[in-house]
């Protein structure tokens, strides 16, 4: 069993059950999935950009990403419907917990000028989204082999019903959220 998964079952679940007064252990919020998305607008000019981005995603997530395609043509962006414009990965179970551990302990502290994650990035239903500007914060990416700095969106989906429950869950995992009072 993964370290964070064990922490969740033994420590976080009883603490959240007591804090929010859940009668059943199954009512306690838990992580459902983590989605990584990389939008690649520059792929319009060079098709190799998608391949390089997919290689980065494989190294970061440990599984093959799905290529996302443009749904409709957009003349302003010079995009046609059906063209590849990004890639995404959905992590669940063990890979999700492994990724979360690396994100919290290694990647987030390596972000330049980092002062904590915004507590305003919850969506109203306990899910949290954050953007990373550089993929090089992950140790799996070798800086000298990077062709371009690419960012990505990371969405952490939970079973929490409110932002307060989601915030408590992520704080219990050690997520570096800023205090809301500031």
UniProtKB/Swiss-Prot annotation:
Gene3D superfamilies: 3.30.1440.10. InterPro entries: Ribosomal_uL5, Ribosomal_uL5_bac-type, Ribosomal_uL5_C, Ribosomal_uL5_CS, Ribosomal_uL5_dom_sf, Ribosomal_uL5_N. The keyword tRNA-binding applies. Keywords: Ribonucleoprotein, Ribosomal protein, RNA-binding, rRNA-binding, tRNA-binding. GO terms for biological process: translation. SUPFAM superfamilies: RL5-like. The keyword Transferase does not apply. PROSITE patterns: RIBOSOMAL_L5. Part of the 50S ribosomal subunit; part of the 5S rRNA/L5/L18/L25 subcomplex. Contacts the 5S rRNA and the P site tRNA. Forms a bridge to the 30S subunit in the 70S ribosome. Belongs to the universal ribosomal protein uL5 family. This is Large ribosomal subunit protein uL5. It comes from Coxiella burnetii (strain RSA 493 / Nine Mile phase I). The gene is rplE.
């Amino acid at each position: 069993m993964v370290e964070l998964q064990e922490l969740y079952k033994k420590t976080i679940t009883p603490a959240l059950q007591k804090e929010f007064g859940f009668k059943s252990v199954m009512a306690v919020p838990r992580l459902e999935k983590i989605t990584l998305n990389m939008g690649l607008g520059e792929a319009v000019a060079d098709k190799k950009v998608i391949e390089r981005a997919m290689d980065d995603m494989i190294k970061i997530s440990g599984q093959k990403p799905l290529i996302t395609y443009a749904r409709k043509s957009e003349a302003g962006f010079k995009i046609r419907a059906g063209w590849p414009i990004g890639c995404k990965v959905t992590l669940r179970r063990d890979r999700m917990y492994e990724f979360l551990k690396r994100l919290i302990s290694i990647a987030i502290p390596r972000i330049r000028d980092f002062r904590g994650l915004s507590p305003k990035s919850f969506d109203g239903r306990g899910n949290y989204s954050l953007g990373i500007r550089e993929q090089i914060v992950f140790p799996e990416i070798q800086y000298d082999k990077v062709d371009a700095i690419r960012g990505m969106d990371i969405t952490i989906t939970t079973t929490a019903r409110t932002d307060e429950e989601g915030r408590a869950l992520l704080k219990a995992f050690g997520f570096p959220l800023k205090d809301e009072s500031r």
